[in-house]
Amino acid sequence: MLSKQISNLNSSSNKPKILSLFSGCGGLDLGFHQAGCETVWANDFSHWACESFRKNIGDVIVEGDIEQINPNDPTIPDCDIILGGFPCQDFSMIWKQPGLEGERGNLYKSFLRFVNAKKPKVFVAENVKGLLTANKKKAIQQIITDFENCGYYVQANVYNFAEFGVPQFRERVLIVGVRLDTGFDFRHPEPTHNETGENGLKPYVTAGQAISNIPQNASNNELLKISDKTRRMLELIPEGGNFTDIPKDHPLYVKGMISHVYRRMHRNEPSKTIIAAGGGGTWGYHFPEPRAFTNRERARLQSFPDDFEFVGSTTEVRRQIGNAVPPQGVVELAKSILPIFSDNYEKVDLHEKLVEEKEILFHDRLSKIRGGKQ
């Protein structure tokens, strides 16, 4: 039934229309496009991310500060879905967590403004797992409450994208809001992959599988320069290891280094999380070759197809890839939302469901969020 709905969407001009915010290079959009949707308007502040989006997703992106854009501007079309990964650095668990008090923490309010103005049937917001604990859990409570007050039934869930076919352990929170009057009983999808391939699931896609057979003429596949010292360090780190595997008595060992630097891939496992920020030690490293991943390898680990060409310098492209939502990771989520656009579903009273939900202590509501693999 669902595959028929997707086919019907793809064969018509009535594809669900996406309004995309904090779009980056377009990873989240691409995943929804692969499920049968299309983006009609998008926004991002980064020039080069906009150029990559324009080249691969479509010439519908507006470059500029979202806080200066009025969602009621007549040039912004109506939509069925609003997507966005509002900036996550202030919620990240890798760095300090200022949360809503950080410089970028309140940008979710721009997302909220668009949802309140456009009233799409559904919205999807992506963020780091640290959002769930930021400001002593007050941040996620405030965010969910604000969207509920706009007339949405909101459900958050932690996704480990390796469990959805991405060759990378990457945990992110996906917040889905369904407009109350739709009566659509949305459920977050169940994983499609696991470590063993048992219980009817597929085995994880491994890093070795993902980065094999890259054509020599593939775009964004330039080797990154590393120092001789870094190369010597990498030769001391085993497959799947990191800086802490360097012998403590070795001259290249530095006391106090943290384990997420100089991480080398394990060919038979998904890669560790691909990130955007940080120095060379956080780039992610090949095995058996003692070198950093190329940007095309990073893109494959983020599940981007080879014909997705990133625009900008090597450093800029690395940032775009690390900031992106892996497209494959949200395809099942997009598919689970599609029935809302067919009206071919059994409706529930979301107003009543929301009243019942609000009677539960927020701490208990949070405890229902499924956690991913550490």
Swiss-Prot record:
EC number(s) on file: 2.1.1.37
Molecular function GO terms recorded: DNA (cytosine-5-)-methyltransferase activity; DNA binding
GO biological process: DNA restriction-modification system; methylation; negative regulation of gene expression via chromosomal CpG island methylation
Keyword Phosphoprotein part of the UniProt annotation: no
Catalytic activity: a 2'-deoxycytidine in DNA + S-adenosyl-L-methionine = a 5-methyl-2'-deoxycytidine in DNA + S-adenosyl-L-homocysteine + H(+)
Keywords, comma-separated and alphabetical: DNA-binding, Methyltransferase, Restriction system, S-adenosyl-L-methionine, Transferase
The SAM-dependent MTase C5-type domain, residue ranges: 16-344
EC category name: transferase
Entry-linked InterPro entries: C5-Methyltransferase (IPR050390), C5_DNA_meth_AS (IPR018117), C5_MeTfrase (IPR001525), SAM-dependent_MTases_sf (IPR029063)
Family matches, as CDD domains: Cyt_C5_DNA_methylase (cd00315)
Domain of life: Bacteria
Keyword Glycoprotein: no
SUPFAM superfamilies with a match to the protein in the record: S-adenosyl-L-methionine-dependent methyltransferases
Record: active site: 88
Family, per entry: Belongs to the class I-like SAM-binding methyltransferase superfamily. C5-methyltransferase family.
Family matches, as NCBIfam families: dcm
Full protein name: Type II methyltransferase M.NgoFVII
